Amino acid sequence: LYVPHNNEKEDVVSPRTRVTLTDISRQSGYSPATVSMILSGRTDVSFSADTVRKVREPAEALGYAPTAKKRPSLFDRKTVLIVCPNVLNPYYSTIVQAIQQAAADKDCDTLVYTTYRDAENEIRILNAVAGSDLAGVVFTMMPQSTELVERVNRLVPVVVIGDRNTSLNVDTVEMNNYSAGAIIAHYMIGLGHKHIAYISTTLNEANSARVRRLEGVRDTYRDECPEGSVIVRSREVTPKEERDNISIEHAVGFELTRKCLGERRITAFVAVNDMVAYGVLDAIRAEGRRVPEDYSVCGFDNIFPSQFLPVGLTTVEHYIADKGRNAFEILHSKMSGESSDRNITRVEFKHHLIVRDSTAAPRGEEKTG
């Protein structure tokens, strides 16, 4: 797998005049990876007689001639690439491990590539995938280069785990982050919190899940608590910071919360994810305040440390491991030819609120519903 250097410009491999695996893929409806395995006579994978026929017939009709046998490839087994922004946040490391467990059950190998949310890194790895022998790709976040992802998906099966997005024409495992934000807001309003702070790392459309969560919180407060307010505090995190600072999410939560503690009307904090929420918790404690007696704190994701004592974190369950396993199952069905490449699968996981000890009614107030 060759990844070009920063100063190299690449695009997906252009069509050639001879009949290619891609030509047969278009005719048969199966991925180039599936076509390649059938036409090369791979013995470590099996396909139904009908699938083999649907690949061999267009190959013969088009006059496909295989190239000379290549030297052994690093990816002679079915190898899947996992693309993620980082592996420090347990949300991503849990997804990665779940994919690897599911892949091992199918005798597949995995590679992991971290982008640190850098669009150039994403483009480089996608172009490298287009010219590789990889069997499939799983994105653990919404890609920034959606058009390129769709083009690569014509060559290599791609599955994306991320925010609900009906405009992305690849297989997806989704969560409705707008609804997740609304659930937390409704709960906080019910506790009696009229003025809350939303604490986040970079807020932009490249990080759509964060924005959708905020929109869900804001809209719910506007509709259910018009006398209340959502105070937004965010800080941009560069790809270099995400790569070099292993505690950047905690640091952002800590820094922004300390700036909010002087605002007397704020009684609760909603963090964009659980890692940021830990920074919020530590900032409150550093100022000699208590959770939930003085401030309530919520997060999103339900990463595994969120249940730990002394204060369990109220958060939204995102079924992290289940999403990883499901994404690989969808990918494997494309890799093995069990599912047609012409079909797009969308799976949406329903979330729910997990209430723990980090939230309570504001001091002196009773829960309203």
Feature-to-residue mapping (PLM):
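Hydrophobic alpha-helical segments within soluble ligand-binding/sensing domains
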Residues: D171-Y198, D219, E249-K259, H318-G337
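An alpha-beta-alpha
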Residues: I184-G228, N343-S358
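Flexible loop/hinge segments that line or gate small-molecule binding clefts
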Residues: T140-I183, L203-N204, M275, D301-L313
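N-terminal helix-turn-helix/winged-helix DNA-binding helices
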Residues: S14-T20, A59-Y91, I95, K106, ...
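Short beta-strand segments enriched in small/hydrophobic residues
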Residues: T34-M37, P72-V87, H195-L203
